[in-house]
């Protein structure tokens, strides 16, 4: 039987500076809010904007890169997967959250917008034998057990220095 597909692609702007924290093992976990805006026409033919806010989480090396280079207002391309979590808040009430767990990132926009630079690919986090946490399905799908994810060592890709690069050098 074929496996399902859980893939999300977003292009949007950061609504906050990245929040990076590290696990006891030293793995970076970076969280951002990403805004995407779509346009549609209403019944009268007027353009209507709708902005959606997405919680995006970067792990490992990709989390370090996101935390270092992204800033509020930066435009970014993100690929990842949807993750539904269920947890008990400090008030004892069960809460649900939906995150995009990023495994690819591309900074967009010019230098003034906090973008530029090459693509950043994150290695897919792998399952570990660590204590498992219940991951609930939002609404009606049951939960699945997922271990906290750990990053595989990434191969370093060196990009040429961008110090002497000007927008006028682009031939198009």
Swiss-Prot record:
Residues 149-161 have a biased composition (Low complexity). It holds the Pfam family SSB. InterPro entries: NA-bd_OB-fold (IPR012340), Primosome_PriB/ssb (IPR000424), ssDNA-bd (IPR011344). Gene3D superfamilies: Nucleic acid-binding proteins (2.40.50.140). Residues 5-109 form the SSB domain. A motif (Important for interaction with partner proteins) lies at residues 167-172. One of its GO terms (molecular function) is enzyme activator activity. GO terms for cellular component: nucleoid. SUPFAM superfamilies: Nucleic acid-binding proteins. Keywords: DNA damage, DNA recombination, DNA repair, DNA replication, DNA-binding. GO terms for biological process: DNA recombination; DNA repair; DNA replication. Residues 107-172 are annotated as: Disordered. It comes from the Bacteria. Residues 109-122, 135-144 have a biased composition (Gly residues). Plays an important role in DNA replication, recombination and repair. Binds to ssDNA and to an array of partner proteins to recruit them to their sites of action during DNA metabolism. Homotetramer. This is Single-stranded DNA-binding protein.
């Amino acid at each position: 039987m074929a496996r399902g597909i859980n893939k999300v692609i977003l292009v949007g702007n950061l609504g906050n500076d990245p929040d990076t924290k590290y696990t006891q093992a030293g793995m970076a976990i970076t969280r951002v809010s990403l805004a995407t805006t779509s346009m549609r026409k209403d019944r009268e033919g007027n353009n209507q904007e709708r902005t959606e806010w997405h919680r995006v989480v970067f792990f490992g090396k990709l989390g370090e890169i996101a935390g270092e280079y992204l800033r509020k207002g930066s435009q970014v391309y993100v690929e990842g997967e949807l993750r539904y979590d269920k947890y008990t808040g400090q008030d004892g009430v069960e809460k649900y959250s939906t995150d995009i767990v990023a495994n690819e990132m591309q900074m967009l926009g010019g230098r003034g917008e906090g973008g530029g630079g090459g693509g950043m690919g994150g290695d897919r986090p792998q399952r570990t034998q660590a204590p498992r946490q219940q991951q609930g399905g939002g609404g009606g799908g049951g939960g699945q057990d997922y271990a906290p994810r750990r990053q595989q060592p990434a191969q370093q890709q060196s990009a040429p220095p961008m110090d002497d690069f000007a927008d006028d050098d682009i031939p198009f």
